[in-house]
Every structure is written in C-alpha cells, then in structure tokens.
Amino acid sequence: MVHLGPKPPQHRKGSFLDVPEYLLKELTELEGLLTVSGETLRKITDHFISELEKGLSKQGGNIPMIPGWVMDFPTGKEMGDYLAIDLGGTNLRVVLVKLGGNRDFDTTQSKFALPENMRTAKSEELWEFIAECLQKFVEEEFRNGVLSNLPLGFTFSYPASQGSINEGYLQRWTKGFDIEGVEGHDVVPMLQAAIEKRKVPIEVVALINDTTGTLVASMYTDPEAKMGLFSGTGCNGAYYDVVDNIPKLEGKVPDDIKSSSPMAINCEYGAFDNEHIILPRTKYDIQIDEESPRPGQQAFEKMISGYYLGEVLRLILLDLTSKQLIFKDQDLSKLQVPFILDTSIPARIEEDPFENLSDVQELFQEILGIQTTSPERKIIRRLAELIGERSARLSICGIAAICKKRGYKTAHCAADGSVYNKYPGFKERAAKGLRDIFQWESEEDPIVIVPAEDGLGAGAAIIAALTEKRLKDGLPLV
C-alpha cells in the first residue's frame, strides 16, 4: 500500500487483517487511481505555468488571470480609518479597519442580514439597503462625526470586468442573486449615488476580489507573504506580477506607468486544465464533471475543492456497491442522492478517534441509513484519506507554478477557506506536496503555506488606503 503525507496514529487506523482479500484488491486499485506521485505533481506544475502565461496573453486561455488594478505593494506603514464592505449571499458585512502603521490593524464589524426578497429586488433597492446599513454603522462608530469622507473598499465577489480599481461592470449574478438593472453596469457609481443620497460621508475608492484582498491584507502584516490563496467550496489564487509580463494590458495602461510596475492578478485558476490534458482524472471525476451544471468548466476546482470531496467518496462507494463488495442487502436509496455527503463527512471520517471507527458507524447510520461492518469502515476511512490527500497535493500545483513563474525561492503563501482551515491533515499534506515538487534539501521548507489575514475586511481597507495614496500623489488608477 502506498501512503503519502502524514499517517494517522496506528491505534486509530487499526489493522486490515479482518478485511477480505477481494476488498483489499479493490482498495489497492483505488489507491493507484487516487495517489498522485511527486513526478506527476511536477508535470502538472510545469503545465500550470504555461496556462498561467497563456492567461496573461492577448489571446487568453482557460485561466482568466484578471488584473486586479492594485498597482502598489502595501508597506505595512499605511495608517488611518477605512471602511470595507462585503456583499455575501445572506449578509452584508461592514467593517471599520484602523490601520496602525506598524503592520498592525484593528477591526470593528457589523453584519446586516439581507431581506428575503433582496436577491430578486430592483437595483435601487439593493444600493439603498447597502447605503442605509453604512449610514447606521457610521453613525454608531463615529458619534462625533467625521472630518472628511471615509474611503471605502468594496469586496465584490461576483464576476465583474474592471478597467481600473474604482470600477467594476457586473458580468452576471451568482450565489442566487438575480437583481435587474445591474448586469452590464458599473456598480461603483450606483452605490456611490445611493450613499450621497443619504449624505453619508463615504467615498467608494476601490472594488476588489476577495482573494486579492487576502493577498494584500497578508502582505501588510507579513513582509514574506507573496500569494493569497482560497481553498474552500471553490479554489483560487492571487499574486503580484509586473505590467511587462502581461501582454493583454497593452494599450490599456497609460504610457507613464512603468513596465516594471506591479499589478495584482486574480488568477481564478479553478479553470486550470479545462482541456483535460494533464490532470489525472478518474472515472468518478469525469462523472462529476458530466453531471455538473457546467460540464467542461472548472476542471481543477472539481478535483480539489471542498464542494466535491464528499461526492467523490459517494461515487466510489456506489461503484463498490454495484460490484456487490460492500453494504450488501442494505437500502441504498440515500446513497444514490447526489451530494448527500458534503465536505464535512470525509473530514469527520478522518477525525474518528476510535479504533473500531464507531463515529463512522454512527455517521453512516444517521445520514445514509446504512449499517456498516468493521472491514467496510476501514475501507471508508482509507478512501477518505486518499481523497483528502489527493485534494491537498493537487491544490499546491497552483502555488508551485506561481512561485516558479515569479522566481520565488522563499515565500509565505497566505491561505484562507474552510478546507485549508478545517480539513484534517490538509496543511501537512500540502507541505509534503510542495517538498515533492521542489525537492528541497534544506531542513526547513523555504516556501510555506500560512494562515491568511482577513481579506474581506482588512484587504479591502488596505487597498482603499493604497488607492487613496495614488490619488493624492497624482498617479493614475489605470
């Protein structure tokens, strides 16, 4: 059996002595399918680099590589009061960020629940609601008033095209929103008009993507940070490139911007390998793709993001039942329901601390109505390990590709998201994957994944501060 990454303590895993030979044979085949060798990781990384380059070209590619129009590095010395908002699927988050100027900041925040009808409301109602929430927040936090307009950074996690940091044309609503009169329009002046109508002393100076916010917030507090990452229900990465390396910017930036100027890039690399050239897809991955709302899209995301981990496990278990190898004479109706096993299920399976895997037993009884045997639970545990390990190892190919592309020999890669933060063993498996790609000889890894700062709040505020400084210095925003 091939074991990659950290091994669970032996007393938790138990032995496979009671597992029938026919099941062990099947498990060995599945280990071969789901195990990603160091050599394969290196090949994927090389292909990843070429797709990153293609995304920056005039012709474009699978990976969008969207310029974020943040053209300065945070120094950590930025100071002042800044506001940030994040429009999520169910809440509006308003954050006051006080930048301390010594790579430090304090935040105060409030959440406002979106009214039930807001997702399908009229455009004016959405902006009026946000302006009203901002007014309440400012009146509460600045009871003596403010001397000048508060700069605001707007985290807008919906597909938008930008030609500068202070504009964003909504391409299409996602996350269940369907508000008329917004798609195809610049959201910044719409929000600004609603704010001015209420005479709230706020100026919207920056519209940002959440992963770009994670990058900038982490660079503010950590001078070694080179990348912002997200690993949760989706996956993404952001980093700084230079204008000269981005052919598709030709003719879109003023002549007085130096070719060596930095430019934040929001990769959206969940779309890596949409052409299915390099990723080691199994028949289970192919089935997930074919039955998804957008077949052929987000190939990388479908193999590594938390949204799909439980579904891979479900499909493998269904396959084993079709061969009459497990769950004999059981009611499988619930197991046949797509996505009935969310990301928490393989995570909880891996976390079961008991040698007899009694937590797994209860889990399958509770969620699927299936009684499991001891050998079946051991197979289920091993499958969860393999799926989690594959996700972690594949996910770092994006990190490795960006580091190689930019020539980073050392880097802190700041990661956020539920899979990174909560999935058992993910950090250790990802670190092992990076070692397998770079084959370092040093005792300490020069490129490491670290917890990210709050990109939705602090990141948006710091970008607002950088934008405000550019305006004061008379520098162009495009």
Swiss-Prot record:
ATP binds at K111. Disulfide bonds: none annotated. It comes from the Eukaryota. GO terms for molecular function: ATP binding; D-glucose binding; fructokinase activity; glucokinase activity; mannokinase activity. Residues 75-208 are annotated as: Hexokinase small subdomain. Residues 209-454 are annotated as: Hexokinase large subdomain. Its EC number is 2.7.1.1. One of its GO terms (cellular component) is mitochondrion. Residues 21-465 form the Hexokinase domain. It is an enzyme of class 2 (transferase). Keywords: Allosteric enzyme, ATP-binding, Glycolysis, Kinase, Nucleotide-binding, Transferase. The keyword Kinase applies. One of its GO terms (biological process) is glycolytic process. It catalyses: a D-hexose + ATP = a D-hexose 6-phosphate + ADP + H(+); D-fructose + ATP = D-fructose 6-phosphate + ADP + H(+); D-glucose + ATP = D-glucose 6-phosphate + ADP + H(+). Pathway: Carbohydrate metabolism; hexose metabolism; Carbohydrate degradation; glycolysis; D-glyceraldehyde 3-phosphate and glycerone phosphate from D-glucose: step 1/4. InterPro entries: ATPase_NBD (IPR043129), Hexokinase (IPR001312), Hexokinase_BS (IPR019807), Hexokinase_C (IPR022673), Hexokinase_N (IPR022672). Transmembrane segments: none annotated. Belongs to the hexokinase family. PANTHER family: HEXOKINASE, HEXOKINASE TYPE 1-RELATED. Monomer. This is Hexokinase. It comes from Schwanniomyces occidentalis.
